[in-house]
Amino acid sequence: MRKLIILGAGGYGQTVADVAEQTGKYDEIAFLDDNSDKAIDTCNNFVNYISDDTDFYPAFGNNEGRVGWLHRLMELGCSIPTIIHPTAYVSPKTTIIAVTTVLPGAIVNTGCVVKMGCIINCGAIVDHGCTLEEGVHVCLGAIVKGENHLPRCMKVEAGTVINNREYQ
């Protein structure tokens, strides 16, 4: 079993912890945060926790901040997982490059490419042939219809419907 260190103990961090716990891959989950009593330490001290049996996950809702932390962790060779809730559906013909969270009830259909640091939130649907560039957040219940190419760090607000090929 492994340990998971989540950077950020806010709402998204709590969600990541909940989903990670449900995957059964971790026997210990802890937080680093600069302003939370739930944290064992501050984010900048993450280097003190690097080990072969520890994964890190930057759980910041700010897309640019999350992607920045991902690059920082990767440069130091930290292990950063993709976390997929057991009730989410990700087509076996979809490619998730790395370090993405797919939350409960989300659907990612066939032929999609999901790049690093994306959040596909509860009940969101990403239909066939879409590409999500790094840091994209598809919020609660949003629908991204087929063959869209969403730009880096785009936020698709809750309940939004993006029509077929609206973003090329």
Set out the residue ranges of the language-model regions:
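Structural signal for interior beta-strand "rungs" in well-ordered beta-sheet cores
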Residues: 83-168
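NAD(P)-binding Rossmann-fold cofactor-contacting core
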Residues: 23-39
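Residues at the starts of beta-strands that form the adenosine-phosphate
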Residues: 3, 27-29, 55, 79-80
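Phosphate-bearing ligand-interacting subdomains
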Residues: 36-89
